Amino acid sequence: MSLVIPEKFQHILRVLNTNIDGRRKIAFAITAIKGVGRRYAHVVLRKADIDLSKRAGELTEDEVERVVTIMQNPRQYKIPDWFLNRQKDVKDGKYSQVLANGLDNKLREDLERLKKIRAHRGLRHFWGLRVRGQHTKTTGRRGRTVGVSKKK
């Protein structure tokens, strides 16, 4: 960052219901949005023709708007399907990139669906146990420890 801050520098940007630190480089700053990782951020910025060495606070309004539209409609900007975080959606079979609040909603809906159809994963979530096949005999214990009293 240069020693002199530009006049139109924004220290905090509000993008997709998320506060973004304007002092960070743009590629890493937009990873604060849920559903946007470093790889996706780089691809979006390349498609939007934005210099990766810029700070987030240096972006103009139309540049921010361009980044948001590309993030929300990645297939229109020729970002491949395998790059997206929601592939072959269970309900409509579409490919999309789910961001911010939509990601929380989709995750909750998926868990509710698994619980409703009484799938093994759904039941494990319901019971509060490990879901991905880990051993649970000794690790992952919660609650108070049960002590053993010594025999006299």
Swiss-Prot record:
Database matches in Gene3D superfamilies: 1.10.8.50, 30s ribosomal protein s13, domain 2
Signal peptide start and end residues: none
UniProt keyword Lipid biosynthesis, yes or no: no
Subcellular location as annotated: Cytoplasm
Record keywords, A-Z: Cytoplasm, Ribonucleoprotein, Ribosomal protein, RNA-binding, rRNA-binding
Annotated Gene Ontology cellular component terms: cytosolic small ribosomal subunit; small ribosomal subunit
Gene Ontology biological process terms from the UniProt entry: translation
Classification via Pfam families: Ribosomal_S13
Primary localization: cytoplasm
Protein family according to the UniProt entry: Belongs to the universal ribosomal protein uS13 family.
Subunit organization: Component of the small ribosomal subunit.
Protein name: Small ribosomal subunit protein uS13
